[in-house]
Amino acid sequence: MSKTFIMIKPDGVKNKHVGNILARIEKEGFKILGLKYLKLSLEDAKQFYKVHSARPFYSDLCNYMSSGPIVAAALERDNAVLHWREVIGATDPKEAAAGTIRALYAESKEANAVHGSDSDENAALEVSFFFKGNELF
C-alpha cells in the first residue's frame, strides 16, 4: 500500500463537486487517511508550491489557490500516486480522457478541480505539509 496527497481546488469546492469527487475516491478503492476543509493563506500557497517559484505561472497559481476554500486529503491504496493521476486525467481538461475528474469537472488548465501528487516522494512531502501524524488514520 502507498499514499498520495490530493486536493480539491477552489473551483472544485465553489462548483459543488466535493461530494462527487469524494465518492469517486471511495469508488476507486482509496482509503481516506485524513481529510481537511480549509483556506490556504497566500504564504501557505507559496510554501506549498515553492517548487514552481521560478515558473512564470507561480504568482497566479498561488493567488488562485488562496482564493477560496480547498479540501486536502491523504489517501492510501496500491500504486496510489499512479492510480490517482489516472483518475484525475491530464492537467489541461481539453486533453483529459473522458470520465476522468478533470474531464468532468475542470473549468480550465488552472481551475482544473483537483491536485494530485506526481511522485511517492512528493506525496510524502505534501501529506506532511497538511497533516500531523496523529491526524492520519
UniProtKB/Swiss-Prot annotation:
Keywords: ATP-binding, Cytoplasm, Kinase, Magnesium, Metal-binding, Nucleotide metabolism, Nucleotide-binding, Phosphoprotein, Transferase
EC number: 2.7.4.6
Keyword Transferase: yes
Top-level taxon in the UniProt lineage: Bacteria
Active site location: H115
Main localization category: cytoplasm
Residues engaged in binding ATP: K9, F57, R85, T91, R102, N112
Known cofactor(s): Mg(2+)
Enzyme class, UniProt record, top EC level: transferase
One annotated GO biological process: UTP biosynthetic process
Keyword Lyase carried by entry: no
Disulfide bonds: none
Catalytic activity: a 2'-deoxyribonucleoside 5'-diphosphate + ATP = a 2'-deoxyribonucleoside 5'-triphosphate + ADP; a ribonucleoside 5'-diphosphate + ATP = a ribonucleoside 5'-triphosphate + ADP
Stored NCBIfam families: PRK00668.1, PRK14542.1
Quaternary organization: Homotetramer.
Name the record gives this protein: Nucleoside diphosphate kinase
Gene: ndk
